[in-house]
A protein has these predicted regions:
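Iron-sulfur-associated redox domains of electron-transfer enzymes in respiratory
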Residues: 1-281
Length: 283
């Protein structure tokens, strides 16, 4: 909705994280809103910026309206790249970030699933709403042999081990952007606690997001987008209460080095047996 509200006319671009055919994640841009699906959905993966900053600057110099989405550190990087010049046509949007899993860990998980199901993974959906509720983080995988499986978050080794905060980059544990003072025009994230203070928005399974404007430009964009959304206003204290990463960075697991050492030498099956906190006999 924000992209559609900002990108009026015929000269615009929207940047975001896209999943590649190799199941990696990289920043790409679209110039047709009908292609927005490529940038939608969650990707719990490190997105490669590539030439996105340079492309953004070039498109702005051409007079295009641009929406650039990313993690807070990626938005900060874009602003540093662009320098002190103000770009009225640029709308920046960051997401509340929990850090990302190690690429080696993700690849090990995919290899394990491919061996288990005797086929290459064709698509990986980290949060499949068709397979379960938006807040259950149901993962779905489609294989080249046509097989399709879903794994509930609460019995998913991928999520359980990652969420132990045991594999993120060192900088994530000292993240300077885990505060209510953001570097973008708008901050987006899951509206955790929605069942408590907005129960009428909880049961449709579409998910509820929090939108926090940090600039006048951000407030203007949200007002324009409201026509396409069902909205409720909340005070900032309520939002921050349930959004941990707007208060503090993730805490480094004291066994991080041990885990990374295991990741270097163990297959995922052994990683799962040692580090999983739940019983996953059937996964």
């Amino acid at each position: 909705a924000l992209g559609k509200a900002w990108c009026t006319g015929s000269s615009y671009a929207v940047f975001g994280a896209a999943q590649t055919e190799k199941l990696t994640t990289e920043h790409r841009y679209i110039t047709d809103l009908s292609d927005l699906d490529m940038l939608r959905k969650s990707k719990y993966d490190q997105s490669r910026i590539g030439t996105a900053y340079a492309d953004c600057k070039r498109l702005l110099s051409e007079g295009r309206k641009v929406v650039f989405t990313g993690t807070p550190c990626q938005i900060s990087g874009l602003r540093a790249f662009l320098g002190d010049k103000e770009y009225p046509e640029l709308l920046t949007i960051d997401v509340i970030c929990e850090g990302v899993p190690s690429p080696k860990y993700k690849n090990s998980f995919i290899k394990y699933m491919e061996e288990k199901h005797a086929s290459s993974v064709k698509t990986l959906d980290y949060r499949d709403k068709d397979g379960g509720r938006w807040d259950y983080n149901v993962m779905s995988l489609t294989f080249e042999n046509g097989k399709h499986i879903t794994i509930d978050r609460w019995v998913n080794p991928f999520f359980d081990i990652w969420m132990q905060h045991i594999m993120s980059r060192p900088s994530c544990y000292e993240c300077r952007y885990t505060t209510s003072r953001r570097c973008s025009d708008i901050t987006l994230g899951d509206l955790w606690g929605v069942h408590i203070f907005c129960p009428e928005l909880y049961n449709d399974n579409h998910g509820s997001s929090v939108m926090i404007p940090s600039t006048e430009k951000g407030r203007t964009a949200i007002e324009l987008a409201k026509q396409q959304m069902t909205t409720r206003e909340l005070d900032m204290d309520t939002v921050v209460k349930y959004a941990n990463r707007m208060r503090d960075p993730i805490a480094m697991n004291e066994r991080r080095e041990e885990f990374l050492s295991d990741l270097d030498k163990m297959e995922f099956k052994r990683i799962k047996r040692k580090w999983m906190r739940l019983s996953l006999i059937h996964i």
